[in-house]
Regions:
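Short proline/glycine- and acidic-rich turn/helix-capping motifs at secondary-structure junctions
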Residues: 17-32, 124-140, 168
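Residue-level signal for pocket-adjacent positions within structured domains
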Residues: 23, 48, 125, 133, ...
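Activity-critical C-terminal alpha-helical subdomain
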Residues: 134-169
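A structural signal for short, well-ordered beta-strand segments
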Residues: 51, 89-93, 128, 134, ...
């Protein structure tokens, strides 16, 4: 833990917390799960676009630096949070739902982040799933597995009533 804390502080990390105490751990997990509402409070009328990145732990610093630079270059309000011990972090981007340009900028940012994670040997999504926004990367990342995935989906959902179009058309 001390080594992790030193690494965090050596890379401008702050407020490093961990606990062996059950109650304190629950508070830390609650804080992690309340991130959405904390971010939303920064700009109450905004919407939140959440994405994630997952890379080998050895590539984590580079990926986060890439995300930070893109966020800064695009002037986005986008806190980065995560439980980075597994190489996974989340970016929560605030945007104006009335401004179509905002959403397009965010989608481009998200796509650049996915391409960077793949370049670094990571995956297009850590926890958020493929869904609609990362469908295009599934074939790129897992080309030899697509037919197997489709056959499993067809076996479980022969009428295609569970999340139609979310991953496979």
């Amino acid at each position: 833990i001390e080594v992790c804390k030193e690494i965090s502080e050596g890379n401008n990390g702050f407020n490093f917390k961990w606990s062996k105490d059950f109650e304190e751990r629950n508070k830390l997990w609650k804080a992690r799960h309340d991130v959405y509402w904390s971010v939303k409070a920064l700009k109450p009328n905004a919407r939140v676009y959440a994405t994630d990145a997952c890379v080998p732990i050895t590539e984590l610093a580079e990926c986060i630096k890439f995300a930070e630079k893109e966020i800064q270059d695009l002037s986005l309000k986008a806190p980065i949070v995560g439980h980075v011990g597994d190489g996974n972090f989340h970016v929560t981007v605030l945007y104006d739902p009335e401004n179509k340009d905002d959403f397009e900028i965010i989608r481009n940012f998200s796509n650049k982040l996915v391409r960077k994670t793949l370049e670094l040997g990571g995956t297009s999504t850590g926890e958020h799933g493929i869904g609609l926004n990362k469908k295009a990367y599934l074939l790129q990342e897992h080309p030899s597995s697509i037919n197997l995935m489709k056959s499993i989906k067809k076996t479980i959902d022969p009428n295609n009533i569970m999340n139609p179009g979310k991953i496979f058309d």
